């Protein structure tokens, strides 16, 4: 999406999107993609400025990309491990642009530690951010979506929800709790899709596969055995965009691998970059 500019009459004109974990990687790419189609995007993460994280990328960077392309976006710094911060995020997002039409649950905190030594505090933190954080934000945005009989919720999952990376020997050591979190999110998404179907709200989960992001680099998940599986962040962003713009009566309750989804619907990777 290098050099992309906003389509003033895009398919998301008039929509408000809230994207968590939007300071880098998948979240940043999703925020930019939605903004390119006219959505007003609220970006949130813990890192707003350089020097606040060991990883590259900030909310300020994401907002600059969007605004430089002619889009509308703002950021709200928040720690999604805290309920009061999630509530403040929702209030400030609505104050900025109005009720949320699209919620993208992408925020995550991840520790790869063998299960026999996994600390309870870190387990609780992962569940709080990835699982309960997504549920709580959904609780906050749902009343507005129900009132308008319209909305889309997308959660970022992982193939680890089903099994670790193959071959098993030496692959993704300590990823059991991460996989548990993602499995919980997938079951949550399919269950919620059933609950809100009559309200014209779609709920789906996207499994990105291995993606070239700063977080993946830190955990050293890309090596000579896995490099052929790596997808660009633009694929995931495009899959999210395609999902939130389709008929919610037909496109809901799905768990899709991003690249396979794009192929199924006739969108090729070459069209995304």
Predicted feature residues:
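A short, exposed helix-loop element centered on a Lys and neighboring polar residues
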Residues: 138-139, 190
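Conserved Rossmann-fold SDR core element
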Residues: 34, 99, 186-211, 249-256
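Substrate-binding pocket helix/loop in short-chain dehydrogenase/reductase
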Residues: 114-115, 119-124, 174
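Active-site loop of short-chain dehydrogenase/reductase
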Residues: 15, 71-72, 99-100, 145-159, ...
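Short-chain dehydrogenase/reductase
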Residues: 2-97, 111, 121
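C-terminal helical subdomain
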Residues: 183, 198, 205, 223-273
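Catalytic loop of short-chain dehydrogenase/reductase
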Residues: 154-198, 210
